Amino acid sequence: SLKAALPPAAPQQGEPFDAIIKDVDELIMPGLSHWQHPDFYGYFPSNGTLSSVLGDFLSTGLGVLGLSWQSSPALSELEETTLDWLRQMLGLSPQWSGVIQDTASTSTLVALICARERSSDYALVRHGLQGQDKPLIVYISAHAHSSVDKAALLAGFGRDNIRLIATDEAYALCPTALEQAIEQDLAAGNRPCAVVATCGTTATTALDPLRAIGALAQQHGLWLHVDSAMAGSAMIVPECRWMWDGIELADSVVVNAHKWLGVAFDCSVYYVRDPQHLVRVMSTNPSYLQSSVDGQVKNLRDWGIPLGRRFRALKLWFMLRAEGVEALQARLRRDMDNARWLAEQVRAASDWQLLAPVPLQTLCLRHCPEGMAGQALDAHTRAWAERLNASGDAYVTPAVLDGRWICLLYTSPSP
């Protein structure tokens, strides 16, 4: 193992750089999964373009921190400008304002904190968890990403106040079930607070019906957050925007540019319709960060949890300029075409099954030898996936769907 190969303590004297690189080649690289490999089909697409890698390299070398606008004006202004470019590419209206977080986990946590405070009239900011006499309820799909559940816990809602809403045959959240759950909580004296919908679930790329969910959210005063971490990138392709029809009814949405779009990790873009809720919750203004331009500029420390910020916008800016919108659209269309082709091959094969719709580039499939079912089929699925992953020839992701093991394959292995 790597731990056994490394010394138990740091060297007292510096070592030659060649020796460090030698250890990278001999010790580190054999223990890594190569996410940039052309046959890496696992987890989710996260292939960083060369232009974004170079932008990230420059950002690290510059070493600037976005504590405030004044600490590095170009950092704040490039982020604001670049995210407005991306907003236009996604087809979002000018009412949306963006900020870069690290991952979708943080973006969803920020959204639920904002939802909590708006619902409680900011009582929890003033009085903590004791400032609310009735439980605040969060509604999520049974197929929502695990980060949504974690965000609700970290935001203080409590596991007992998270409602898992049933899905339909396409694994999308059922609005009727959501409405029933809201009515039950109102009857019980609870306070419905937020609903997290998903545009492109992790396991099946299911598309929750945002327009119907948004109508319910507005009717009952719920904050609607949309997790479109992976699928959101597809909205730069105009013919895909039907997938998030109703997005303008949402209060916030997350799109991970470090996934399918091709920006080097990490670069999670969080858009919010009314930034005052975000700023009111996150704002800090110690004397050593104040300047004469406060109130005239966007201080990004008030748009998220950390005080310090990396210059993440630089790698996004590099990629957008080097690639251009048309090339990015062409790459995503290629990936979706490849997924449709592969889905046709799976459907045509008698010993393979396709287990969910393929709206984008994710396939849920299973190899089914004749006469094999149940636990034997589960064991077979896990075994062939593990053999493939161990071979180094390709990488796929085993997962559970409807209580049975399947395999996820993403057809976007290279930019």
PLM features: what roles do these ranges have?
Residues T103, S107-V279:
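Conserved PLP-enzyme active-site core in the AAT-like
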Residues D245-S350:
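Active-site C-terminal subdomain of aminotransferase-like
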Residues P357, T362, A390-L408:
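Conserved PLP cofactor-binding pocket of PLP-dependent enzymes
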Residues Y410-P415:
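Conserved small/polar residues in nucleotide/adenosyl-binding loops
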